[in-house]
Amino acid sequence: SPVPSGSARPARALDIISVAFVALLLISNIAATKAFMVGSSTHYLIFDGGAILFPLTYIIGDVLSEVYGFARARRVIVMGFVASFLASLTFFIVQYLPPAPDYENQEAFAAVLGVVWRAVVASLAGYLAGQLLNSYVLVWIRRRWGTKHLWARLIGSTIVGEAADTILFCTILFYGQMTFGNFVNYTVTGYFYKVLLEVVLLPVTYPVIAAIRRVEGLKKDEVFDR
């Protein structure tokens, strides 16, 4: 149940959580420019560098939605969207600025940070749809079935959100650009990896949510709504 709005005290931890969310998102977007494989040359799984940190944005998104509600979570998600777009626009401008006479890394800069707008659209569309769905589904499950079974809210929202994110991102960016087998490999591997990580980190997510509620002066299962 939401905390009454009688107090004007601002949220104590929301700013720190928001910064962590946006930072993980931006780092993941840059790391995602490299694809790598796990396995042998004949039997392998394909990931991108974003797989290391990006799933944590869904866990933080769960924390935001569970403790602060959909409205505040949505604001942080939009902040991440704006920051990602601004980063892409900055890299695009810098990429086409004339390099200094003694600057020898123009091709390397373009290869790593150079903007391909198809990739930008894929990333932003997948991120926005996935994160908003993740937050909405978690709050919807809570309202529909009550505050019990937090694990079901966390996993259920991730299943829906990551599906939208992964399918949109992979389809826009890679469909028709790689063999169909590699496309399926990349899409399915990325999706199940992210969902599995949510499950594995449940023992961490639970105490984190409880700790943030204590910081905000909330009782168990209360939502910060001030």
What do these predicted regions represent?
Residues 144-163:
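Internal alpha-helical transmembrane segments of multi-pass membrane proteins
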Residues 22-37:
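Alpha-helical transmembrane segments of multi-pass membrane proteins
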Residues 45-54:
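Structural signature of hydrophobic alpha-helical transmembrane segments
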Residues 4-20:
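N-terminal membrane topogenic signal
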Residues 157, 185-198:
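Pore-lining and gate-forming transmembrane alpha-helices of multi-pass membrane transport proteins
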Residues 212-226:
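Short, highly charged, low-complexity non-transmembrane loops/tails of multi-pass membrane proteins
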Residues 93-118:
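Membrane-interface interhelical connector segments
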Residues 84-102, 123, 127, 131:
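Transmembrane alpha-helix/helix-exit interface in multi-pass inner-membrane proteins
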